[in-house]
C-alpha cells in the first residue's frame, strides 16, 4: 500500500479519461501512483474548484492556474478533452509545488486516507482517541481489516515524530491495541476499493496486541502474519473461518518458516492458554498438531473441512467437545481409544453407516449423527450402553424414515423419561406411554415381571 512519507518523489497523477453520467455531470478519472501502488479517483470540475480555492487561500497557490469555468458548451466532447488535459496539468503542477509539504486538502482530494499508511493510522488514532474507551468496555470486539493492520505494522518501522495535534498521535493506536481483549481480523482476495492493492497480499504483525483473549479471523492469508508471538501468552479462544488452512499449524505457527512440531518443541511456540479452537470452513485434513500446540484445549470445532479419519486425540486430556460436521468421514474405528472422555461429539453431515465404533464411548452425553448414511435399525444397538447420553440426533439418515421411528429408537435405547432428547425434540407423553406399553408387553412375552428389568 501507499506510504507518501517514504515515496514522495515517486508520486504522480494523470487524468486517464472522463465520464458523463445520466444527469449530464462529467467526472474526471484521476489515476494516482505512489511507487508501485495505484488507485483511481473520480472528481467533477466543482470539486477541483473547491480544492483550488482552499489551496489559494491557505497555501499560496497561484490563482490563475486552474482551467476556467465555462457555462455554455461545457458538455461538448472537444471541450471536455481540453479541460481533462488542463486539469491534469493543474494537478501535476500543484503536486510538484507542494510535494515537500503536502497539505491535508490535497491528500483528501486524492483519497490518500483510503490507501496511505500514515493517513490510515491517523484516522485510527482519531477514532481511538474519541471512542477507544467505549470499544474496550466490557471486552467488546473490535474489527480490524488487513489494510489497517498492515498500516500499523509499517508505522512501527517509521521514525516519525508524533503530530502536534494530540488526537492524531500514534500512541492512541498503540494504547488501544495493548488493551484490546477481543481482536477480529478480516481479509479478502479482492482489491481495496479502486486500487491495485489486494487485502491478502499485505503482510502484517500483531506484536502490539498483548492482552488479547479471543482471536477471530475471517478470510485471511495466515502466511502473511509474520509476528504473532505475544498472543501465544494470552489467547484462550481462536476462531479462523474460511481462510484455506490446510493444517492447524498454518495459523498456530504462522510466524515460523518451518512449521514443524514435536512433543519436545520450544515452549514459546505452544499456545498453553487456548481452551477452544474453531477452524470451520477451511481445508484441514489433520488435527494431529493440536495435541502439542494446544495441550490444554477443551473444545475443537472443525466443521466444513476435508477430514477423512478421526485421529488419536487422547493426549488432549481436557478435550470434552469435538465437532466434525460436514467433513468426508466414511468409517470410524475404536473411538474409545482415540477420544478419551469426550462429552459432546458432532459427526453430522458425513458418510457414516456403521455405528459399532461408538459402543464404548461411555462418557458421551451429546451425540449428533444427523445426515449420515445409517440405514439399518440394528445399528442403534451399538448405542444402548451409552447410559450418560441424553441427546441424540439421527434425523437425515435413512433409518429415520422407518415407521414409528421415534418410539422404536426410544425403546431400543431404553429411554423412557422426558429428560432424553431425540432429534432436538423431547419425547411427548404419548411417545413415552407407547414405549412403556411396548416394554411391558415384551417383558410379558419373555415371562418376566417389571421388577426383573
What are the language-model segments listed below?
Residues 14, 29-31, 39-42, 49-50, ...:
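Beta-strand cores of modular interaction/reader domains in eukaryotic scaffold and signaling proteins
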Residues 129-300:
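LRR N-terminal entry segment and analogous cap-like coil->beta motifs
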Residues 28, 46-47, 63-76, 102-113, ...:
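Short amphipathic alpha-helical segments embedded in low-complexity Lys/Glu-rich regions
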Residues 199-210, 222-247, 252-270, 274, ...:
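Leucine-rich repeat domain C-terminal region
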Residues 45-48, 52, 80, 84, ...:
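Generic preference for well-ordered alpha-helical elements
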Residues 22, 33, 39-43, 47, ...:
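Short amphipathic alpha-helical molecular recognition features
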Residues 31, 46-56, 67, 88-96, ...:
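Amphipathic alpha-helical interaction motifs in eukaryotic regulatory proteins
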Residues 1-169, 438, 444-453:
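Phox homology (PX) phosphoinositide-binding domain
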Amino acid at each position: 500500500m501507499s506510504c507518501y512519507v517514504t515515496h514522495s518523489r515517486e508520486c504522480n497523477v494523470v487524468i486517464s479519461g472522463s465520464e458523463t453520467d445520466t444527469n449530464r455531470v462529467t467526472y474526471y478519472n484521476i489515476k494516482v501512483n505512489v511507487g508501485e501502488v495505484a488507485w483511481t479517483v473520480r472528481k467533477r470540475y466543482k470539486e477541483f474548484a473547491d480544492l483550488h480555492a482552499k489551496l489559494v487561500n491557505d497555501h499560496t497557490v497561484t490563482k490563475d492556474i486552474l482551467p476556467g469555468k465555462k457555462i455554455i458548451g461545457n458538455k461538448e466532447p472537444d471541450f471536455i478533452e481540453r479541460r481533462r488535459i488542463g486539469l491534469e496539468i493543474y494537478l501535476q503542477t500543484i503536486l510538484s509545488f507542494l510535494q515537500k509539504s503536502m497539505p491535508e486538502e490535497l491528500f483528501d482530494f486524492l483519497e490518500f486516507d483510503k490507501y496511505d499508511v500514515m493517513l490510515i493510522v491517523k484516522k485510527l488514532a482519531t477514532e481511538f482517541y474519541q471512542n477507544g474507551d467505549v470499544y474496550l468496555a466490557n471486552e467488546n470486539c473490535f474489527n480490524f481489516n488487513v489494510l489497517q493492520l498492515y498500516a500499523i505494522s509499517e508505522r512501527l518501522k517509521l521514525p516519525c515524530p508524533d503530530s502536534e495535534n494530540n488526537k492524531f498521535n500514534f500512541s492512541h493506536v498503540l494504547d488501544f491495541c495493548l488493551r484490546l481483549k477481543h481482536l477480529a481480523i478480516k481479509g479478502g482476495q479482492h482489491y481495496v476499493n479502486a486500487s491495485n492493492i489486494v487485502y491478502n497480499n499485505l503482510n502484517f504483525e500483531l506484536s502490539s496486541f498483548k492482552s488479547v483473549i479471543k482471536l477471530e479471523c475471517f478470510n485471511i492469508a495466515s502466511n502473511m502474519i509474520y509476528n504473532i508471538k505475544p498472543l501465544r501468552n494470552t489467547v484462550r479462544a481462536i476462531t479462523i473461518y474460511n481462510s484455506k488452512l490446510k493444517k492447524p499449524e498454518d495459523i498456530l505457527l504462522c510466524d515460523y518458516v518451518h512449521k514443524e512440531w514435536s512433543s519436545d518443541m520450544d515452549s514459546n511456540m505452544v499456545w498453553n492458554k487456548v481452551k477452544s479452537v474453531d477452524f470451520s470452513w477451511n481445508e484441514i485434513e489433520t488435527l494431529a498438531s493440536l495435541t502439542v500446540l494446544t495441550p490444554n484445549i477443551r473444545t475443537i470445532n472443525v466443521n466444513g473441512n476435508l477430514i477423512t479419519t478421526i485421529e488419536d486425540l487422547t493426549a488432549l486430556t481436557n478435550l470434552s467437545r469435538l465437532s466434525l460436521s460436514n467433513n468426508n468421514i466414511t468409517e470410524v474405528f475404536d473411538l474409545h481409544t482415540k477420544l478419551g472422555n469426550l462429552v459432546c461429539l458432532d459427526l453430522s453431515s458425513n458418510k457414516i453407516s456403521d455405528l459399532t465404533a461408538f459402543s464404548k464411548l461411555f462418557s458421551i452425553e451429546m451425540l449428533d449423527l444427523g445426515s449420515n448414511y445409517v440405514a439399518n435399525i440394528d445399528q442403534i444397538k451399538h448405542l444402548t450402553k451409552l447410559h450418560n447420553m441424553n441427546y441424540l440426533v439421527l434425523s437425515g439418515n435413512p433409518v429415520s424414515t422407518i415407521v414409528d421411528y421415534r418410539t422404536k429408537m426410544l425403546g431400543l435405547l431404553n429411554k423412557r423419561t422426558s429428560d432424553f432428547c431425540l432429534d432436538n425434540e423431547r419425547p411427548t407423553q404419548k411417545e413415552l406411554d407407547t414405549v412403556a406399553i411396548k416394554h411391558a408387553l415384551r417383558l410379558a412375552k419373555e415371562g418376566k415381571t417389571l421388577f426383573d428389568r
